[in-house]
UniProtKB/Swiss-Prot annotation:
The lineage of its organism: Eukaryota, Viridiplantae, Streptophyta, Embryophyta, Tracheophyta. It holds the Pfam family HD-ZIP_N. Residues 280-305 have a biased composition (Low complexity). Probable transcription factor. This is Homeobox-leucine zipper protein HAT3. GO terms for cellular component: nucleus. Keywords: DNA-binding, Homeobox, Nucleus, Transcription, Transcription regulation.
Amino acid sequence: MSERDDGLGLSLSLSLGFNQKDPSSRLNPMPLASYASSSHMQHMQQSNYNHPQKIQNTWINMFQSSERNSDMRSFLRGIDVNRAPSTVVVDVEDEGAGVSSPNSTVSSVMSGKKSERELMAAAGAVGGGRVEDNEIERASCSLGGGSDDEDGSGNGDDSSRKKLRLSKEQALVLEETFKEHSTLNPKQKMALAKQLNLRTRQVEVWFQNRRARTKLKQTEVDCEYLKRCCENLTDENRRLQKEVSELRALKLSPHLYMHMKPPTTLTMCPSCERVAVTSSSSSVAPPVMNSSSPMGPMSPWAAMPLRQRPAAGSH
C-alpha cells in the first residue's frame, strides 16, 4: 500500500492485495479484473472530463470491441445444427468461411434459384420479353418431349396409328357395305372385321372417314347448286330491273301516246236492231250502205221501211 499527498488535502492509496493471507483471493482472479476495470473506468472518466470531444468515439470503440468479442465467443462455441432457422441464415452467410450443414446446403440452393429467377426477370424486362419467350419455348419443348415419350411408351399404339393399307377386295367389300349401311352396330363391325381379317377398330375408323368424305362431297355439290341458283337469280334480277327502268321512262314521256287512235264503241239501234260503229271523237260515223235497197245513202239513224214477209200459203 502506498499513500500520496499532493498538497491539496487529497490522498490516493493503491492496494493490490498480494500480501493478504486469504487463499480465496489468490485462487479467484476476479477481484483483480474488477479492480483493473474500475481503475480503467476512472481513468476514462477523468480523461473524458478533461477531453469532452472524445466521449463519443470512446463509446463507439467500446461497443465495437464488445461485438467482436461476442462474435468470437460464438464461433469458438461452435454451431448447432438443431438450432432455429435464424442460425441457418447465419450459416448461409458464413458459407464462404468453410462452415456447412444440410440445412445450409438446402437454403443456399433455394437462394441461388431465387436469385437466378430475379436475374432472368430483370433481363426479360430490359430485353423486351425475350427471356419469357425462351421460357415458353422451353416449356413447350418439354411438354412435346413428354408427349412423345408417352406415345412411344404405349404398347402397339404406333403400329395402330399407321395408315391402313387395304387390298382391292377389302376396299370393294367395305364400299358395298357402306352403300347398304352407312353406320354399323357392334355385331356387324365384328362380323365384317372377321370377314376381312381386320380389327374392329380399323373397320370403325374406316366407316368414320368414309362418312366424313361423303359429307364433304355432298357439301361441295350443294355449294355448286346454290352457286348456280344465285347466278340465275342475279340474271333475273337484272332483267327485271331493266324492264322497270323502261316502264319508268315511258311513264315520264306522255307525248308518245298522242298519236294513238281512241278506242271505238259499238252501239245498237233499238228500232232496227242494227249495230252502228261510233267513235268517241266528234267525227260522224260513215254511212252504212244497204245493197238490197235502191235508195241512196241514208243516215244510220233514219227509219227503215219494213217489208212484209210473204205468207207461207201464197206460193
